[in-house]
């Protein structure tokens, strides 16, 4: 998958976007840039994708940091499940994940590859600094500018 492939398919409206946990948290808790990027990602002609690790991580973080917001998170997830594709994280490691410093983030990249996503939507500095070009790693603000 090259940048030219992505650009051509983006023009045709065929863009698969894996939404990382940090974007989901910000989308649930506010209505700023991450929320607007989430809405764009789940809106046709895009296909939004979550992996099972994102959902588990989201639930753990809300239980630990935002227990009073768990009902809002659960409601958000119920609505999200109607608009996204949920994928499992493959067990088989891929060579590209060595470029991700945080070992805990590597399964997210694995899921992105398995789901053949065009964009990984994240605010995670490890992904943003990785130098990966496939999938394209974008912040919510960058994604909104497309």
Regions found by a protein language model. Give the residues of each.
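Active-site neighborhoods of divalent-metal-dependent phosphate/nucleic-acid chemistry enzymes
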Residues: 83-120, 125
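Acidic, PIN/NYN-like endoribonuclease modules and their adjacent C-terminal/linker elements
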Residues: 1-4, 114-121, 125-146
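Metal-dependent nucleic-acid phosphoesterase active-site entry motif
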Residues: 1-32
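PIN/NYN-family metal-dependent endoribonuclease catalytic core
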Residues: 19, 31, 35-65
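Hydrophobic/aromatic ligand-binding patch that stacks against planar heteroaromatic rings
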Residues: 40, 111, 129
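Alpha-helix capping/helix-boundary segments
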Residues: 23-24, 54, 126-127
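Domain-scale selection of a single, long terminal region
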Residues: 56-92
